């Protein structure tokens, strides 16, 4: 799969760092696009060229980790605070693959992980009020990121739409129907989930 690919999309996290090492060990002459400073650093150390996302005409495949993924490949990417840029690369890619261990796979996304909103700083107060109307308890992570905690989520698609329609919201950490596959590492080996 990797041999025919020139430009990779790479997210952030420890798993992606291991993937970078694999790419280098496999002797692949590739370029990468990534929003992660840590991944950029690892790529630089390994001699993998990182190009600006705007300079990537085509991304065949992008790999990323996540906080939680359900059986329909919906995922939360709430931890790193770079979900907007990760989602741009995911949408650019012809195939978006999540790399996770078995502990991150759930039947349905639950409310243990917050939905994080990237917001225009001047809209943080307004967005907070609108999110509260949708049933969220809101915690400000910083001036651009709001963490939304819900007691329950009945309809992921509707929640995703409702949050994106709030003026001042740039993007959400809910990756609804974005991933095409997940590579899951477990005690019994590797399995592939796909939509």
Which stretches of residues belong to each language-model region?
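N-terminal active-site beta-alpha-beta segment that forms phosphate/nucleotide-binding
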Residues: 1-64
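Conserved phosphate- and dinucleotide-binding cores of soluble alpha/beta proteins
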Residues: 38-195
